[in-house]
Amino acid sequence: MKTQQFTVIDPLGIHARPASQLVAKATPFASAIEVRTEEKAANLKSILGVMGLALKQGSQFTLYVEGEDEDQAFEALATLLTEMGLAQ
């Protein structure tokens, strides 16, 4: 299992457009991919789940990836989060 904590830095938070890009990036991977806050957890392959987290600027979350392609999935998602300026 690979995990990393992130803090949302985008002033708009993770709203519909970046959430859909994260879901699109996560969906092809076989690994289980989850985002957890202190209060909630969501499957990163579910747009409704990600939107339900209501991640605003300053929110902290942890990315969990577990499965046969976890290394590739984790790298792709962590890179997308940072390159889009969503989280660090």
UniProtKB/Swiss-Prot annotation:
Disulfide links within the chain: none
GO cellular component, one term: cytoplasm
Principal subcellular localisation of the protein: cytoplasm
Organism: Lysinibacillus sphaericus (Bacillus sphaericus)
Residue ranges of domain HPr in the record: 1-88
Entry-linked InterPro entries: HPr (IPR050399), HPr-like (IPR000032), HPr-like_sf (IPR035895), PTS_HPr_His_P_site (IPR001020), PTS_HPr_Ser_P_site (IPR002114)
Family membership: Belongs to the HPr family.
Modes of activity regulation: Phosphorylation on Ser-46 inhibits the phosphoryl transfer from enzyme I to HPr.
A GO BP entry: phosphoenolpyruvate-dependent sugar phosphotransferase system
Pfam families cross-referenced by the UniProt entry: PTS-HPr
Function: General (non sugar-specific) component of the phosphoenolpyruvate-dependent sugar phosphotransferase system (sugar PTS). This major carbohydrate active-transport system catalyzes the phosphorylation of incoming sugar substrates concomitantly with their translocation across the cell membrane. The phosphoryl group from phosphoenolpyruvate (PEP) is transferred to the phosphoryl carrier protein HPr by enzyme I. Phospho-HPr then transfers it to the PTS EIIA domain. P-Ser-HPr interacts with the catabolite control protein A (CcpA), forming a complex that binds to DNA at the catabolite response elements cre, operator sites preceding a large number of catabolite-regulated genes. Thus, P-Ser-HPr is a corepressor in carbon catabolite repression (CCR), a mechanism that allows bacteria to coordinate and optimize the utilization of available carbon sources. P-Ser-HPr also plays a role in inducer exclusion, in which it probably interacts with several non-PTS permeases and inhibits their transport activity.
Name listed for the protein in its UniProt record: Phosphocarrier protein HPr
Originating gene: ptsH
Sorted UniProt keywords: Cytoplasm, Phosphoprotein, Phosphotransferase system, Sugar transport, Transcription, Transcription regulation, Transport
Domain of life where this protein originates: Bacteria
Phosphoserine: residues bearing it: 46
Enzyme active site: 15
Subcellular location: Cytoplasm
